[in-house]
Design a protein with these regions (language model features):
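N-terminal and secondary-structure boundary signal
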Residues: 1-240
C-alpha cells in the first residue's frame, strides 16, 4: 500500500492491495489495520510546533523529561491520568483505552515534529473500513484497528485491538466444561486482541511498510453490535 494521505479510503486501498498481491479478500476474513494509517486518513496528525503547552503540560514535562508539546497532545487525548512515571504517562484515553501516552505515536510518521493520536472513534473507523471492503468484495469480513501496547509485569509489546467491527471481540466460555468436566467460571477469551497480536507478526513495528494484514481461517462469531467493553471496569481493575 502507498503512504496514506488525509481523505484516503483505507478500505478501498486494502481491497486493491490484497487483489494486487494475489490474495483477494474472501468471506469471513479478518482485516487488521494499524491505527496510524487510520488516523492519517482521517487527518488526525498533529505538528508539535503548532501546539502551545498548558501549565499542566509544562509541569508533567518536567516530571517525565518529555517534550512539553508532546505532553500537551497527550493531555488533549486523555480522560484521566492513571499514573506518571519516569518518561511515561499512563492514561485513560477519551475512547476509554488505558495505555501509555494516550496512544500518541511518533513512529512511522513523516516529519520530525509530527505525531499521530489514536482515531477519535476507533469503532466507528473500523465500521467505515469494513463497509468499504464489504461493498467492494461482496464478502462479509471483520475489521480490527490495532495499536502496540506494553503490559504490566511483562517485557516487550504486543498489538491489541483499539477498535473493532463485525464480530464478537470476546469469547465467553463461562459455563462450558473442560476435558475433565470442570465447569469454567471466569474464562473469557480476548479474541480481538489475540487476532491483533497475530497480525503484528506480519505487520511489524519498524520499517516493514505493511499497514494491514489479513487473518484467514479463524471462525469468529459475526456480530453487528459494538457494545462489548474491551477495557476492564475501573472498580475491577487491580492496577488502578
Amino acid at each position: 500500500m502507498p503512504f496514506i494521505q488525509p481523505g484516503d479510503k483505507i478500505g478501498k486501498m486494502i481491497f486493491q492491495a490484497a487483489k494486487k498481491q494475489g490474495t483477494p479478500i474472501q468471506q469471513h476474513d479478518v482485516i487488521v489495520v494499524t491505527h496510524v494509517v487510520v488516523s492519517k486518513s482521517e487527518g488526525n496528525v498533529v505538528n508539535l510546533d503548532e501546539v502551545k503547552p498548558s501549565e499542566k503540560a509544562l509541569e508533567i514535562a518536567k516530571q517525565t523529561n518529555k517534550d512539553p508539546a508532546m505532553v500537551e497532545v497527550i493531555l488533549r487525548e486523555t480522560k484521566e491520568i492513571v499514573r506518571i512515571g519516569q518518561n511515561s504517562i499512563i492514561t485513560q484515553t477519551n475512547s476509554d483505552i488505558v495505555c501509555a501516552n494516550a496512544g500518541v505515536d511518533r513512529s512511522n510518521v513523516s516529519g520530525d515534529r509530527n505525531v499521530v493520536p489514536l482515531p477519535k472513534e476507533p469503532n466507528s473507523s473500523a465500521s467505515r473500513i469494513r463497509k468499504e471492503i464489504m461493498h467492494l468484495s461482496d464478502a462479509e469480513v471483520a475489521v480490527i484497528v490495532s495499536d502496540t501496547h506494553g503490559r504490566p509485569f511483562r517485557m516487550g509489546e504486543i498489538n491489541i485491538a483499539v477498535g473493532y467491527a463485525g464480530f464478537k471481540p470476546i469469547r465467553d466460555r463461562r459455563g462450558e466444561k473442560d476435558l475433565f468436566g470442570y465447569v469454567l467460571r471466569i474464562k473469557q477469551t480476548a479474541i480481538a486482541d489475540e487476532l491483533a497480536s497475530a497480525a503484528e507478526l506480519v505487520i511489524g513495528q519498524a520499517n516493514e511498510g505493511i499497514p494491514a494484514a489479513i487473518v484467514r481461517g479463524y471462525n469468529y462469531t459475526s456480530d453487528e453490535e459494538q457494545t462489548t467493553q474491551l477495557m476492564r471496569a475501573k472498580e475491577k481493575d487491580l492496577f488502578r
